[in-house]
Amino acid sequence: MANALLMQTSSKPMPGLQSWPQLCRLQSVIERRFAFSRSLVGRALDTFGAQWADEFETLLSSLFEDEAALETAMKGYSAFAMDSMRHQRAFEKTREYPNKTYAEAAQAVYFNEAHMLREYLPGLLLSHFLWPHHYRQLQFFDMAFAAPLARAADKRFAEVGVGTGVYARRLLSCMPQAHGLGYDISPSSCQFATQHLAAAGVSGRFAMRLQDIVAQPMEPVPWLVCVEVLEHLEDPVAFLRVLRQAVAPSGKAFITAALNAAHADHIYLYRNAQEVWQHLDAAGFHVEQSFVAAAYAPSAPGVPVPLAAAFVVS
């Protein structure tokens, strides 16, 4: 993990970065305080080009008004990435996640306000643009889910496990007719996502609910998003069956899972995308499209690396 998500040690020239003032400010903060990540921005710009830069610039501009705010966010990202790296190194040795219950993970992470607002959520937010497999998943989301939603007459959607609000923002920003509901069990996630969507100017079309949809089922919707929730659960299939009931007849869902990705709150270990597919099938979903991306190349043959797996299902 160190060689791709955090410990970049060589700085590459970034011609044209001056076209994006916030990215320039972010790079300045990184060079000054977080030199181990100095090539993240340049590498992503080289890989994904102007579209990535435009999108990241828009997000940064709406949420972080000055370098001090960017530095605070980058501090959260650094802590998030370092913690992830430590867990991944341990996983590479044991090939298992530490044994923990959902209640233990929830208490340590989701209901830990200081950790969520200072590290976890800012780190996760920036990772959508600084980690290649996270951004590639956003691209797949745009193509395989957002595009058909944009053509649909009924643009109502729900997101279960809203987290930072990145995916909801993506839909609301590109579709003025879209309206959404967000569900999360973490008060901090609800707060962060609400503030994020307000800063983006789209909160008027999105209602956030602090609600466990297993204990209190949600109303079915034609379009449903659930990003990286399954690995946080003890019984993903039971949760997927609840999600299946939340998708209206003829509706579609975008469901993802993190594979071989050790984090403090990851409980269920998916080793490959086929295991997720089997769980989706067991819950009654039909897989229409799928996508898998690796975080980085393995350090040696057979060493597991984090993967992002996404599915469009009906």
Feature annotation, model-predicted:
Residues T164-P176:
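Conserved SAM-binding loop of SAM-dependent methyltransferases across substrates and taxa
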Residues G251-A258:
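Conserved beta-strand signature within the Rossmann-like core of class I S-adenosyl-L-methionine
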Residues A238-P249:
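A short glycine-rich, Lys/Arg-flanked "PGG" loop and its adjoining helix->strand segment in the class I
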Residues V214-L224:
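A short acidic, Gly/Pro-enriched loop at the edge of an enzyme's catalytic core
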Residues A153-G163:
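Conserved class I S-adenosyl-L-methionine
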Residues L23-Y110:
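N-terminal auxiliary segments of SAM/dcSAM-dependent transferases
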Residues H179-D184:
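Conserved SAM-binding motif I beta-strand of class I
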Residues S186-S188:
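Conserved SAM/SAH-binding beta-strand->alpha-helix loop
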